[in-house]
């Protein structure tokens, strides 16, 4: 790693710590509202904790507000939520549309396990069914190792620009592009666009999000 790259990474990490700290303090009242709404709806747990692959593939516990029914994967397995998925709760639909279900990941960012901008954090050993019905391990897809060279993020090129319903392995193209060209200015731009998408509540739409 060159001196310039080291300075860039230090600036990115400092930016993450500052913004995550401000976000945690500013959003504290919202956490209480969301937690109360989740509890009142079905009485289940407020948070959902799941192992994800982080920087260089190291596992960490990603924290989210629960947006599905309790034990949603029992009988279904690790199946990604689909449009109008019956496992998603009423409160969960609002949280997903505005990305507020990922608000607790500010803590993951503050701890250094995630960044504000980067590839989406995947589960270790995550699989995907390709068009022919073949099961494919995402870790075996070209570009997986390269996307692990940076911390996973709340938002990123793939999250903002890739169509929501394309296979994740195709989103790796966006992730690889980010890894090669990321900068603090690109991060700021993606964060601002993400705020706009959140304000519109359009994270779950099929087409253009903003």
Enumerate the language-model features and the residues they cover.
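Short, structured helix-loop boundary elements
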Residues: 8, 85-88, 151, 185
């Amino acid at each position: 790693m060159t001196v310039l790259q080291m300075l860039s990474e230090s600036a990115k990490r400092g930016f993450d710590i500052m913004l995550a700290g401000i976000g945690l303090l500013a959003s504290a009242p919202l956490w209480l509202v969301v937690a109360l709404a989740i509890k009142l709806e079905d009485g289940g747990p407020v948070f959902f904790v799941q192992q994800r692959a982080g920087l260089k593939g190291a596992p960490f516990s990603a924290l989210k507000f629960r947006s599905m029914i309790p034990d949603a994967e029992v009988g279904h397995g690790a199946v990604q939520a689909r449009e109008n998925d019956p496992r998603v709760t009423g409160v969960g639909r609002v949280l997903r549309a505005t990305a507020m279900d990922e608000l607790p990941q500010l803590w993951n960012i503050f701890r250094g396990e995630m960044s504000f901008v980067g590839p989406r954090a995947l589960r270790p050993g995550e699989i995907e069914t390709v068009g022919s019905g073949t099961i494919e391990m995402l870790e075996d897809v070209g570009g997986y190792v390269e996307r692990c060279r940076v911390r996973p993020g709340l938002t990123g090129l793939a999250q903002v620009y890739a169509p929501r319903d394309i296979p994740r392995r195709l989103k790796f193209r966006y992730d690889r592009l980010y890894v090669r060209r990321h900068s603090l200015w690109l991060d700021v731009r993606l964060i601002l666009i993400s705020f706009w998408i959140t304000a519109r509540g359009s994270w779950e739409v099929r087409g253009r999000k903003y």
